[in-house]
Amino acid sequence: MNITVLAVGTKMPRWVDEAVAEYAKRFGRDVAYVLKEIKPEKRGAGVNAAQGMAAEEKRILEAIPQGAFLVVLDERGKAPTSVELAEHLKTWQQNGEHVCFVIGGADGMTDRLKQQARMMMRLSSLTLPHGMVRVLLTEQLYRAASILHNHPYHRE
């Protein structure tokens, strides 16, 4: 199964990169996990939030793997339990889907991009730093995979 995470933002703290890499390597052979950073649009100097999100949208759309099942992370999305996320992962795997998760920039994502998504998901009702979202999403995807493999990582 292929999982791509597109994250607007670069230059994350080292602990973020290390944590994402740690969970990504735990997936094993049956999950190909890729994190792609999308360059954020600079704000100011005549570039407002809407213009910035539009520029980021273009970069995101260019980076989405062809035919991928698109999941955007958004505060208005559904918050699945770990077991529910595992069920989604199982379905995507059975359908041979390449799943692409999108983490928007500081101002979020355009409505047009959200409308293209086949699923809107949130990790929390709290506002989280972008680096933390990368780590939490990767950990939860690993947890979902471990649930499917009856690995003792997840406990009920």
Curated annotation (Swiss-Prot):
Function summary: Specifically methylates the pseudouridine at position 1915 (m3Psi1915) in 23S rRNA.
Reaction it catalyzes: pseudouridine(1915) in 23S rRNA + S-adenosyl-L-methionine = N(3)-methylpseudouridine(1915) in 23S rRNA + S-adenosyl-L-homocysteine + H(+)
UniProt protein name: Ribosomal RNA large subunit methyltransferase H
Residues at which S-adenosyl-L-methionine binds: L73, G104, L123, S124, S125, L126, T127, L128
Gene3D superfamilies given in the database record: 3.40.1280.10
Family statement drawn from the similarity comment of this UniProt entry: Belongs to the RNA methyltransferase RlmH family.
Membrane-crossing residue ranges in chain numbering: none
SUPFAM superfamilies with a match to the protein in the record: alpha/beta knot
Domain of life per record: Bacteria
GO cellular component: cytoplasm
Taxonomic source organism: Neisseria meningitidis serogroup C / serotype 2a (strain ATCC 700532 / DSM 15464 / FAM18)
EC number: 2.1.1.177
GO terms assigned for molecular function: rRNA (pseudouridine-N3-)-methyltransferase activity
The keyword Transferase is assigned to this record: yes
Keywords for this protein: Cytoplasm, Methyltransferase, rRNA processing, S-adenosyl-L-methionine, Transferase
Keyword flag Cell division: no
InterPro entries, sorted: Alpha/beta_knot_MTases (IPR029028), RlmH-like (IPR003742), tRNA_m1G_MTases_N (IPR029026)
